[in-house]
């Protein structure tokens, strides 16, 4: 069983913000498999899917971004999923909009959702898919940028990368992180 986690913030006011692109990828995966999200035991929404004979839980923490680790650990414990079988999808303001980067492990890189997951797990060695939300942000306070909505032009670019993110996550499910990295990472990311 694999666990694919898309990070974001709950509440309607956060929909379509840069910070919620992880949620959008999970929604795309649920759409592809024609399933809806249900409330899980641990402050998360999830759906169970099967892809090429492999069981997958797609999950959206219903905590705020900075507390995502609680929902991830709850799901891992409930479904008995080891850390080697999880992929976390999040926004990254250091990657150009329209680019993605997969990694087998690493630091939080300033992403507070990843930071909390690392804190709760006590380790950094879990796979992640970072979705670029743009490097063209004002210096200083990044919170207004990541919590802001995409411009109309940016939204088109974001919408075009979401299916690729879902495909990369499904590649991870079938072939593992190394294969997904080799297939989807690009030099410009």
Curated annotation (Swiss-Prot):
KW Cytoplasm (keyword) present: yes
GO biological process: protein quality control for misfolded or incompletely synthesized proteins; rescue of stalled ribosome
Superkingdom, natural source: Bacteria
Predominant location: cytoplasm
UniProt-annotated site: Stabilizes the basic form of H active site to accept a proton, residues: 91
Residues involved in tRNA binding: 14, 64, 66, 112
Record site: Discriminates between blocked and unblocked aminoacyl-tRNA: 9
The keyword RNA-binding is assigned to this record: yes
Signal peptide: none
GO MF terms, alphabetically ordered: peptidyl-tRNA hydrolase activity; tRNA binding
Catalytic activity, EC: 3.1.1.29
Keywords, alphabetical: Cytoplasm, Hydrolase, RNA-binding, tRNA-binding
Positions annotated as active site in the UniProt record: 19 (proton acceptor)
Compartments, as annotated in UniProt: Cytoplasm
Reaction catalysis annotation: an N-acyl-L-alpha-aminoacyl-tRNA + H2O = an N-acyl-L-amino acid + a tRNA + H(+)
InterPro entries: Pept_tRNA_hydro, Pept_tRNA_hydro_CS, Pept_tRNA_hydro_sf
GO cellular component, one term: cytoplasm
Summary of the function given for this chain in its UniProt record: Hydrolyzes ribosome-free peptidyl-tRNAs (with 1 or more amino acids incorporated), which drop off the ribosome during protein synthesis, or as a result of ribosome stalling.
Family statement drawn from the similarity comment of this UniProt entry: Belongs to the PTH family.
Subunit relationships: Monomer.
Protein's recorded name: Peptidyl-tRNA hydrolase
Gene name as annotated: pth
